[in-house]
Amino acid sequence: MRLIIQPDYQSVSQWAAHYVAAKIKAANPTPEKPFVLGCPTGSSPLGMYKALIDLNKKGIVSFQNVVTFNMDEYVGLPKEHPESYYSFMWNNFFSHIDIKKENTNILNGNAPDLDAECARYEEKIKSYGGIDLFMGGIGPDGHIAFNEPGSSLTSRTRQKTLTTDTIIANSRFFDNDINKVPKTALTVGVGTVLSAKEVMIIVNGHNKARALYHAVEGSITQMWTISALQMHEKGIIVCDDAATEELKVGTYRYFKDIEAGHLDPESLIK
């Protein structure tokens, strides 16, 4: 696992965006062999998306031959609802870049058969040869996508009941009214994420410090699903200083030392 420690959220976002752009450019994708990108929602990736939009507008990276698969979607929320993840992606990312609409994939939380929708999603990912780079964020309890504590580390795309903590955390997007927050969601599984060729997770803020500790120094456990990233041969966590507050000093210094030559985002794009 790589741990890229940046001073603040803006630096995290810039590094993550340049890393994604570099991976897309290096793959030299074509319509026949597109680059397949896994996309998260929430507050963590917003800065990265803004930076990617800027790189796209400057002509540094193109998304014309990129196919995306989103991590999750609420069940029962109309896709046009301002807080659906469909709306989130189009408002904050897709509508600002040169991606083709038919190349974007988001789970349908209003499908008549939700189990069939999840199975279809997994099969479509496989049809592209898997995901090249899965981006993500985590919750304060270490959950990836909506894989709450206790989720199987080999799980695939399925319907999940949200924990009270997640509902409370997400209520900030629903007028701070927990009764407006959907109680279930469709989500890729931990196994789905780990099947990607590469995984990059953004962790920022003091409230994620305990989760980062479990991700880097803790044992692998279903109670902190982010800890499963330790098993991935190409896992990267990009974090800010505030998120490292529960790491051992030795761990912090180790990663700062070995990644010292890779912290400048501009150096990532050749």
From Swiss-Prot:
It catalyses: alpha-D-glucosamine 6-phosphate + H2O = beta-D-fructose 6-phosphate + NH4(+). The record marks 151, 158, 160-161, 254 as: Part of the allosteric site. This is Glucosamine-6-phosphate deaminase. It comes from Bacteroides thetaiotaomicron (strain ATCC 29148 / DSM 2079 / JCM 5827 / CCUG 10774 / NCTC 10582 / VPI-5482 / E50). InterPro entries: Glc/Gal-6P_isomerase (IPR006148), Glucosamine6P_isomerase (IPR004547), Glucosamine6P_isomerase_CS (IPR018321), NagB/RpiA_transferase-like (IPR037171). CDD domains: GlcN6P_deaminase. The gene is nagB. Pathway: Amino-sugar metabolism; N-acetylneuraminate degradation; D-fructose 6-phosphate from N-acetylneuraminate: step 5/5. Its EC number is 3.5.99.6.
